[in-house]
Design a protein with these regions (language model features):
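Alpha-helical transmembrane segments of integral membrane proteins
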Residues: 1, 237-240, 270-307, 318-437, ...
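Hydrophobic alpha-helical transmembrane segments of multi-pass inner-membrane transport and secretion
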Residues: 1-12, 243-279, 384-409, 644-678, ...
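Small-residue-rich transmembrane alpha-helices
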Residues: 6-9, 302-366, 408, 699-761
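Membrane-proximal extracellular/periplasmic loop immediately following the first transmembrane helix
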Residues: 8-73, 177, 183-194, 202-203, ...
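Short juxtamembrane loops and helix-capping segments at transmembrane helix boundaries
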Residues: 15-24, 160, 164-175, 231-239, ...
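Mid-to-C-terminal secondary-structure elements
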Residues: 91-104, 117-246, 449-638, 642
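Membrane-helix entry/capping segments
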Residues: 206-255, 275-278, 290-291, 320-343, ...
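Interfacial "coupling" helices/loops that link adjacent transmembrane helices in transporter permeases
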Residues: 262-303, 664-702, 756, 763-764
Length: 772
C-alpha cells in the first residue's frame, strides 16, 4: 500500500500542473504549425506578438490576450551583490491573464512604468536577503549597456508552472520594435470569456489569423494551459521537463498491480491462518452460528487488518517521501484533502473485501463434521491460490525485464558516440562582446588568447549551444536550392550551426571532404559577405542532396546573411539533438553575432585549478558579468531526465514487486506445510531426507516460475519494443535479459521456499504425526 500511495501522490502531482492559475480552464497557448517537405508537420510555441492585439480586437469570444518574449540571462546588481538571472519581457496584459502568487508589491505597476521590474521570490532573496525588495533599485547589464530599474513586485513561481522566470520586464522597455517580423522567442496566449463554447468554424477562423495578416504567416493551433505539461508532443524550449500521459497510465497500472499483489498475499496468508481455526468454526456451527455470521466475522477481521495496514502505510509514506522526492525530483507533500480521504477509504474497503472474501466464503462452507476433521483441501482452492502466486511471478519477472531494458537504453543514450567530443569540455555563456557594436570589437578572441597560455587549456571556440539544439525553434533552419545535372532545381531544408574557425577542431568533428570555413575574421563580416558564404555540410545533407561530390557547389538561399552559399567541406554526422531524433541535414558556418556559447577543452588533470583560472580571466575582462559554466557531458545527460526518472521509479517498484511476490510464496508455502504436516512426517518416517522434502516443494514452485516466465517474456518484450520505438537511436533488447530476469526470481523464490520448508522438514516426525 505504501508503494500505491507514493504512485498516487506522483500521479496527482503530474495531473495538477497550472492549478494555481485562476483562469486555467480558459487560457490557451498559440502553437504555430508549419508544413515541411515529405508531409512532415513542425510545431513551435513561437509566434508573433501582434497576434495578441488582433485576437483582442477581432474576436469577441476572446476576453484578453498577452505575449512574452523569452530570452536568456542577464546580470543583476544590487549594491555589491551580482547574480545572473533568466529574464522575460511581458506584455502589459500579462498579469491580467496569469495569476502568479504575489509575495509583495503590485506587478501591475510595470504597465504604467517600463522602468519597473518584477522579481521571482528566489531572485529577491539572492539580492536582498530577508529585507523587502519592493521599491529597491537594481542595475542590469544588457549588451554592454547599463540600465536601472525599481522592483515593483516579488512573485512566487510555483514548480508546477510551465512559465518560469527570475526577472520580468515590461515589453515597453525592449530596445527594438516588436512587430510582425519579430518572431524570436515570442509566446502568445489568449483567454476566452467564461462560459464560451467555440464551434469548429470559430476555431478554424482563429487558426488562420496569422495567415490572413501576413503572407509568411502560419496556421495556428490552440493548446489549453492545463494540457501543456502532459500533452505537448513537440519540442518546447520553455519547458525543460514535460510530463507524459503514457507514464501516467503506466504507473497507474503498476499501482493497481502492486495493490492486487498485496491483496493476493493477504488472501493466501489469511487462508493459511484460517486453516488453523477449523475447530473454532465447527464449534460455532454446532452452537447455531449461521454461515452469514461467519462470513461477516472474517470480512470484518479483514477490514480491521486493512485499516491498520493503511495507517502504517500512511506513516511509512510520510517517512519515505523525502527519499522518493529525490528520486523523482519533486517536492510532493502528503496533504489531507478529499481525494486522499477517498483513496484511503477505497483502499480499506477494496483491499479488505478483496483479501478477506476468499477465506471468509471458503472457511464458512464446511459442515461441522468436516471442520472438526480439519476441513478439506479441495483442488479448486489450491489451484486458485497457486494461480494467484503465478500471476505475481509474471508481474515480477516482467518488471525486472522492463527495468533492465530502461537502464540499458539510458546507458546507451549517455554513452553513444555522438560524433563530437563531450568529455572534459567546459561550456560557458558567452558575454564577451558588445552586441550593439559587435563589428567594432571581438572580446572572444582576446579571451581565447589569454586562456590558451595555460597548458591545461587545450582549445577554445565560440558557437551555438549544442546540448539540445533547436529546442522547438524554427529560426535556425533555412531552405537551399541548386540546379542539378538534369537542369532541374532541387532544394533541401538544412539546420544552420554557427561557430568560429576553431569550432570543428575543438568539438572533435571529423572532416570527410574539403576544408573548414577558416578562421580569418576579415572574410566573414556578418550580413555583408562580398560574394558568398562558405559552409560545411554534414553527411545526412550530402546523402539527401543526392550529389556525388557537392564540394564547390553554389547554393542559393534567402537567409539573413546573403543569397549564396558555397559548400567548402563535408563533416561526419554529429548529434546536435537528443537521440530521440535522427540527425537532420545541417550546415556549419561562421557567424560572430551568433556565438552565444564558449566551448573550452581542458585537461582532465587539475580541473579545479583550471576552472578557477578560466573564471578569473573572464572576470578580468568582464567584471560586470558572472562566469557561469557547466560540463558538456552533464548538459547532454539532462536531455534524458525522463528516462532516468522512469528507470529509478521502475527499479524501486520492481524491488517492491519482488518483495511482495516472495511474501506470496511465503504465504503459500506456509499454507502448504500446515496442510501437509502429516505427509511430511510419514515421508520422514519412511526414510526421506529433509533435503529431498525441500526439493519436492521447490520443484512445485519452479513449475509456477516457469509458466510465469513464458507469459512474462512476450508481454515485456512487446511493451519495451513500443517504448524504445520513441528513440531514433536504440539499444538492442538483448536475449540474455530474459533468462537473467527469470533466474533472479527463481533464485529468490527458492531461497524463500528453502527457509520456510526447511523448518517444517526438520521437525521430529513424531511431532508432525501428532500435529493433526
Amino acid at each position: 500500500m505504501t508503494a500505491a500511495f507514493l504512485i498516487y501522490l506522483w500521479i496527482v502531482d503530474e495531473l495538477t500542473f497550472e492549478d494555481f492559475q485562476i483562469n486555467r480552464d480558459s487560457i490557451y497557448r498559440l502553437v504555430a504549425v508549419e508544413q515541411e517537405g515529405g508531409g512532415q508537420v513542425k510545431e513551435s510555441v513561437y509566434t508573433v506578438a501582434p497576434l495578441s492585439k488582433v485576437f483582442r480586437e477581432e474576436f469577441p469570444q476572446v476576453e484578453n490576450a498577452t505575449f512574452m518574449l523569452n530570452f536568456g540571462t542577464l546580470n543583476l546588481h544590487s549594491g555589491t551583490d551580482l547574480i545572473e538571472a533568466t529574464y522575460k519581457y511581458v506584455d502589459t496584459t500579462f498579469f491580467d491573464v496569469f495569476s502568479f502568487p504575489v509575495i509583495a508589491g503590485d506587478p501591475g505597476l510595470i504597465k504604467k512604468d517600463p522602468q519597473q521590474i518584477v522579481l521571482a521570490e528566489s531572485t529577491a532573496k539572492k539580492l536582498f536577503g530577508r529585507t523587502s525588495a519592493v521599491g529597491r533599485e537594481v542595475t542590469c547589464q544588457f549588451f554592454g549597456q547599463t540600465f536601472r530599474y525599481k522592483v515593483a513586485a516579488v512573485l512566487k513561481v510555483p514548480r508546477k508552472s510551465h512559465i518560469t522566470f527570475e526577472v520580468q520586464l515590461s515589453e515597453q522597455a525592449y530596445y527594438e520594435p516588436i512587430n510582425w517580423d519579430f518572431v524570436e522567442g515570442t509566446s502568445v496566449y489568449i483567454q476566452l470569456r467564461k462560459g464560451t463554447v467555440l464551434s469548429e468554424t470559430d476555431w478554424r477562423k482563429m487558426s488562420r489569423v496569422w495567415l490572413n495578416h501576413r503572407d509568411k504567416g502560419m496556421r495556428l493551433e490552440f493548446q489549453l494551459l492545463k494540457d501543456i505539461h502532459l500533452q505537448t508532443s513537440f519540442k518546447d524550449p520553455e519547458v525543460g521537463n514535460h510530463g507524459n500521459m503514457s507514464q501516467i497510465y503506466l504507473f497507474t497500472v503498476l499501482a493497481v498491480l502492486i495493490v492486487f499483489m498485496g491483496a493476493f498475499n493477504f488472501t493466501t496468508l489469511s487462508t493459511a491462518r484460517a486453516s488453523q481455526r477449523f475447530k473454532e468454526i465447527g464449534v460455532r456451527k454446532v452452537t447455531g452460528a449461521k454461515r452469514k455470521v461467519l462470513v461477516m466475522q472474517f470480512l470484518s477481521e479483514s477490514l480491521v487488518q486493512a485499516f491498520l495496514s493503511l495507517i502504517l502505510a500512511l506513516a511509512l509514506t510520510e517517512l519515505l517521501l523525502p527519499l522518493f522526492n529525490r528520486f523523482v525530483e519533486k517536492d510532493i507533500v502528503l496533504t489531507a484533502n478529499w481525494q486522499t480521504v477517498l483513496f484511503v477509504l477505497f483502499g480499506i474497503i477494496g483491499v479488505g473485501c478483496l483479501a478477506g472474501a476468499f477465506p471468509a466464503f471458503y472457511m464458512s462452507q464446511f459442515n461441522p463434521l468436516q471442520s472438526f476433521k480439519g476441513g478439506s483441501s479441495t483442488g479448486k482452492k489450491g489451484t486458485l491460490i497457486k494461480g494467484l502466486v503465478c500471476v505475481q511471478f509474471v508481474i515480477a519477472i516482467a518488471m525486472v525485464i522492463c527495468t533492465s531494458v530502461v537502464f540499458k537504453q539510458l546507458h546507451y543514450l549517455q554513452n553513444a558516440d555522438l560524433g563530437l567530443d563531450k568529455e572534459d569540455m567546459v561550456v560557458a555563456d558567452c558575454g564577451l562582446f558588445d552586441f550593439m557594436s559587435y563589428m567594432g570589437g571581438y572580446g572572444i578572441d582576446d579571451y581565447k588568447q589569454e586562456v590558451l597560455k595555460n597548458p591545461n587549456v587545450r582549445s577554445v571556440t565560440g558557437g551555438v549551444e549544442l546540448s539540445d539544439y533547436l529546442q522547438g525553434h524554427r529560426t535556425e533552419e533555412n531552405s537551399f536550392s541548386w540546379t542539378n545535372e538534369a537542369g532541374q532545381v532541387d532544394s533541401l531544408r538544412m539546420v544552420g550551426v554557427a561557430g568560429d574557425g576553431d569550432f570543428m577542431e575543438t568539438l572533435g568533428l571529423t572532416l570527410l571532404k574539403g576544408m573548414s570555413f577558416g578562421a580569418d575574421k576579415k572574410a566573414y563580416m556578418d550580413g555583408a559577405y562580398e560574394k558568398e558564404l562558405p559552409i560545411v555540410i554534414n553527411e545526412t545533407a550530402w546523402k539527401m542532396m543526392n550529389v556525388e561530390d557537392p564540394v564547390g557547389m553554389l547554393l542559393q538561399n534567402k537567409g539573413w546573411y546573403g543569397e549564396a552559399s558555397r559548400i567548402v567541406g563535408i563533416v561526419k554526422d554529429f548529434n546536435f539533438q537528443p537521440l530521440r531524433e535522427k540527425v537532420k541535414p545541417a550546415y556549419l558556418y561562421y557567424s560572430r553575432r551568433l556565438l552565444n556559447t564558449l566551448y573550452i577543452k581542458i585537461s582532465p588533470e587539475n580541473k579545479a585549478e583550471t576552472l578557477k583560472f578560466l573564471k578569473e580571466e573572464y572576470e578580468k575582462m568582464r567584471p560586470d558579468n558572472v562566469f557561469t559554466y557547466h560540463f558538456f557531458s552533464d548538459a547532454l545527460n539532462l536531455n534524458y531526465v525522463h528516462e532516468r526518472q522512469l528507470g529509478q521509479m521502475f527499479l524501486v517498484f520492481t524491488i517492491l514487486a519482488i518483495i511482495v511476490a516472495m511474501m506470496g510464496v511465503f504465504g503459500l508455502v506456509a499454507l502448504s506445510t500446515v496442510q501437509r504436516t502429516k505427509e511430511i512426517g510419514i515421508r520422514k518416517v519412511n526414510g526421506a531426507h529433509s533435503r529431498r522434502i525441500v526439493w519436492m516443494f521447490c520443484r512445485e514452485y519452479m513449475v509456477g516460475v516457469g509458466i510465469a516466465f513464458f507469459i512474462a517474456c512476450p508481454l515485456s518484450y512487446l511493451l519495451m519494443l513500443r517504448w524504445i520505438s520513441n528513440f531514433a537511436y536504440q539499444t538492442t533488447i538483448s536475449w540474455w535479459l530474459f533468462p537473467l530476469a527469470g533466474c533472479v526470481i527463481l533464485l529468490i523464490m527458492m531461497l524463500t521456499v528453502i527457509v520456510q520448508v526447511g523448518r517444517a522438514a526438520s521437525r521430529n516426525p513424531v511431532t508432525s504425526l501428532r500435529y493433526e
